[in-house]
Amino acid sequence: MPEGRRLRRALAIALLALVAVTGLLMMAKEQQMGQEISPFDGHSNLALAQAVARGDTQGIHAQATQDRLRERGDRQVTLLQWAVLSQQPDSVQALLDLGADPAAAGLDGNSALHTAAMLQDAQYLRLLLAKGAQVNVRNAVTGATPLAAAVLAGREEQLRMLLAAGADTTLSDRLGDTPLHLAAKINVPHLALLLLQAGADARARNQQGVAFQFYFSQTPAHLQNDELKAQFRELDKWLQGHRLATHYAQQ
């Protein structure tokens, strides 16, 4: 498969994952407004899921059993993911206290940690990390880590939190892409620099046999705004200082 086609396919997969999260966010908001819609419709834990979406911790404790906590909704979304997507921190904490597993695979193979890493509000990731969540848990389908999810969503704060919690910058997905490759594919040099400073391997190659610099080199300088150019200069400076500049050449 030509490299350009591979890149478009990888980005399409990432976009679909973000679209799925956005769709469930909208569904959660609708349920909070009293509309009867839930990915748990028809499931035995519907009442529990409704309590989760409302932030009703008493209802959560009254409804929770181990079987109900483990039962998934449509698209395999977990209750803990539903709490995150419903933006209910009290529900997240209540579910964690009841033993909900933040590493369990759910929506599109992601864990709750992946989901929290993608949201704008970082408090949900903070709650999961405070509970000792497995920071390097893999997506059950793609093999991607929460660090990769944060990169794809462009979440700098979550990326920093995951790095501080010990996230491994060198772990790749099933296509061989590390978070550094993904940062280059979506053209975010400032996130790439953070990963490099945290120990990411600049020479790592994916299944296509290319390092992250190849993807950055596909963005012509004349298409960059001033902010992006400044970020590229900082990245170049770091690479030159670590004798890696020959691996990266912009057109």
What are these regions (language model features)?
Residues 2, 23, 27-47, 198, ...:
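Ankyrin-repeat-protein effector appendages
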Residues 73, 106, 139-140, 173, ...:
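Ankyrin repeat boundary/linker residues
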Residues 2-18:
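N-terminal Sec-pathway targeting helices
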Residues 69-70, 102, 135, 169, ...:
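Ankyrin-repeat inter-repeat connecting loop/turn
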Residues 56-64, 88-96, 121-129, 155-163, ...:
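Ankyrin repeat structural motif
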Residues 33-82:
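N-terminal segments that cap or nucleate solenoid repeat domains
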Residues 44, 76, 109, 142-143, ...:
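Start-of-repeat signature of ankyrin repeats
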Residues 50-55, 82-88, 115-121, 149-155, ...:
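Ankyrin repeat A-helix N-terminal signature
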